[in-house]
Curated annotation (Swiss-Prot):
Pfam families: HTS (PF04204). Pathway: Amino-acid biosynthesis; L-methionine biosynthesis via de novo pathway; O-succinyl-L-homoserine from L-homoserine: step 1/1. Keywords: Acyltransferase, Amino-acid biosynthesis, Cytoplasm, Methionine biosynthesis, Transferase. GO terms for cellular component: cytoplasm. Gene3D superfamilies: 3.40.50.880. It is an enzyme of class 2 (transferase). GO terms for biological process: L-methionine biosynthetic process from homoserine via O-succinyl-L-homoserine and cystathionine. It is found in: Cytoplasm. InterPro entries: Class_I_gatase-like, HST_MetA, MetA_family. This is Homoserine O-succinyltransferase. It comes from Citrobacter koseri (strain ATCC BAA-895 / CDC 4225-83 / SGSC4696). The record marks G111 as: Important for acyl-CoA specificity. Substrate binds at K163, S192, R249.
């Protein structure tokens, strides 16, 4: 899917170097089709890196995706230039009267922070409530899953003693589910989280359908039956080097982190890691865009009435 972004966004050149099809706004304006409108609420500190990761996954289909970047944290960023945020991000007040085909809420490094201590917790709740009436389908990633489960279902925060970091095996539970269509029976995906997602807890608190689990019984991929919300507890968007960057950052900070599981060749951090989850990540996002967004979203977004027909 050619992603449609502003001509000056740094991701344009970065992704083109990877042979990813990026369509700038100036070129897209000449095509007489309605693009899918996808809003990305980027909660990660290194926003440009995260933009590249998600835009890459949204790019592989013949339909246009018009991407809008959203921020809700008004504090000065230490990792992203203010000029970049001012040029390419909108505030919630700018888009609250609009409707969108899809919304992606990224993870955030807040696993050890209580929800009420998160600086923008009220804004998170506001966006999730707004999305019920203004977005066809929302995809939550990693920490955003934990936040959404608390806001939407009242599930208390579950925190692991040690951080889960590495590339783990998962298995699908419903081979014919649309979101897992084309998945291998077992597949790899990276995790980097303190949050805990026991499948039994999610079944007890919600009517969400768990579609894939880790080998230890943690929920990895689950969704509502009406396709309006979907959750992925790992990081299928991560680059090959992302877990390594996090690991060496924590080493330098004196945190004595565990070496990410099943990640470095021969479990040696001096060896260059390889991405073993790219095909899974691409297929997951393609399925979400096709079956959870495109096939149920209304043609006229002024009348938000998703249908399963």
């Amino acid at each position: 899917m050619p992603i449609r972004v502003l001509d000056e966004l740094p991701a344009v050149n970065f992704l083109r170097e990877e042979n990813v099809f990026v369509m700038t706004t100036s070129r897209a304006s000449g095509q007489e089709i309605r693009p899918l409108k996808v809003l990305i609420l980027n909660l990660m500190p290194k926003k440009i890196e995260t933009e590249n990761q998600f835009l890459r996954l949204l790019s592989n289909s013949p339909l246009q995706v018009d991407v809008q970047l959203l921020r809700i944290d008004a504090r000065e960023s230490r990792n992203t230039p203010a000029e970049h945020l001012n040029n390419f991000y909108c505030n919630f007040e700018d888009i609250c009267d609009q409707n969108f085909d899809g919304l992606i809420v990224t993870g955030a490094p807040l696993g050890l922070v209580e929800f009420n201590d998160v600086a923008y917790w009220p804004q998170i709740k506001q966006v999730l409530e707004w999305a019920k009436d203004h977005v066809t389908s929302t995809l939550f990633v990693c920490w955003a899953v934990q936040a959404a489960l608390n806001i939407l279902y009242g599930i208390p925060k579950q925190t692991r003693t040690d951080k889960l970091s590495g590339v783990y095996e998962h298995h699908i539970l419903h081979p014919h589910a649309l979101l897992t269509r084309g998945f291998d029976d077992s597949f790899l995906a990276p995790h980097s989280r303190y949050a805990d997602f026991p499948a039994a807890l999610i079944r007890d608190y919600t009517d969400l359908e768990i579609l894939a689990e880790t080998e230890d019984g943690d929920a990895y991929l689950f969704a509502s039956k009406d396709k309006r919300i979907a959750f992925v507890t790992g990081h299928p968007e991560y680059d090959a080097h992302t877990l390594a960057s996090e690991y060496f950052r924590d080493v330098e900070a004196g945190l004595s982190p565990n070496v990410p599981y099943n990640y470095f060749p021969k479990n040696d951090p001096q060896n260059k890691p390889r991405a073993t989850w790219r095909s899974h990540g691409n297929l997951l996002f393609t399925n979400w865009l096709n079956y959870y967004v495109y096939q149920i979203t209304p043609y006229d977004l002024r009348h938000m009435n998703p249908t399963l027909d």
